[in-house]
């Protein structure tokens, strides 16, 4: 068996996000990384191969983000993301972008500058913890993954366990991913991620899932 891997550098462009997932501790600082900050992170990652761009979904619905983008000559946050993808390529790192739910034309734009894209399915069923998170609608997430397949974009996805789903929900969610992979052949990685309670979130007192299960 041959196991391959690539070192990556984590680039959290912003923690502004339209979703309010009950387990998430990502939205802390309400900040945006500047181009200079991104460049510094990329330059420090001299031994990395991949730049992992992550950020909150649809960040540009917030007025403060719109203002920040306008001051720098960008119309949308996706425009800024693509510019940072281009910077990464110029500095010799392969971009991988986790952008949340995307339209087909947005995937096309990202495809040009990314080695791969990613979106965790999390669960293929509706859950209480996503009640205030329109971007976690499983139908919309599945549609994004399928559209990436139609566009032949290498893709990473996976499930998040311990967030209120039943055992058969996990099995069903993995089956959904397997079916998409069979149909389009673009899924390169499937992550099985465990829920970890985070202080200050509605689910801070939930027990994490048993690793043996």
Give the predicted meaning of each segment.
Residues 3, 93, 153, 185-188:
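A structural micro-motif
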Residues 13-17, 107-108, 200-202:
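Short, solvent-exposed polar/charged micro-motifs at secondary-structure junctions
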Residues 3-37, 62:
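Canonical Radical SAM [4Fe-4S] cluster-binding loop centered on the CxxxCxxC motif
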Residues 8-10, 14, 54-56, 100, ...:
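Short loop/turn motifs enriched for small/polar and acidic residues
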């Amino acid at each position: 068996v041959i196991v391959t891997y690539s070192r990556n550098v984590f680039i959290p462009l912003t923690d502004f996000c339209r979703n309010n997932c009950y387990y998430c501790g990502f939205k802390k600082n309400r900040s945006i990384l500047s181009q200079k900050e991104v460049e510094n992170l990329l330059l420090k990652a001299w031994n990395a191969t991949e730049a992992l761009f992550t950020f909150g979904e649809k960040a540009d619905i917030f007025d403060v983000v719109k203002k920040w983008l306008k001051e720098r000559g960008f119309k949308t946050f996706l425009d800024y993301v693509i510019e940072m993808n281009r910077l990464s390529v110029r500095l010799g790192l392969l971009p991988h972008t986790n952008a949340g739910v995307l339209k087909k034309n947005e995937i096309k734009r990202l495809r040009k500058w990314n080695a791969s894209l990613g979106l965790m399915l999390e669960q293929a069923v509706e859950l209480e913890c996503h009640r205030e998170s329109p971007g976690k609608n499983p139908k919309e997430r599945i549609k994004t993954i399928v559209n990436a397949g139609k566009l032949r974009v290498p893709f990473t996805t996976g499930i998040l366990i311990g967030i209120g789903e039943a055992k058969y929900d996990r099995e069903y969610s993995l089956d959904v991913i397997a079916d998409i992979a069979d149909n389009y052949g673009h899924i390169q990685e499937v992550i099985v991620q465990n829920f970890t309670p985070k202080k200050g979130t509605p689910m801070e007192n939930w027990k994490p899932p048993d690793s043996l299960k």
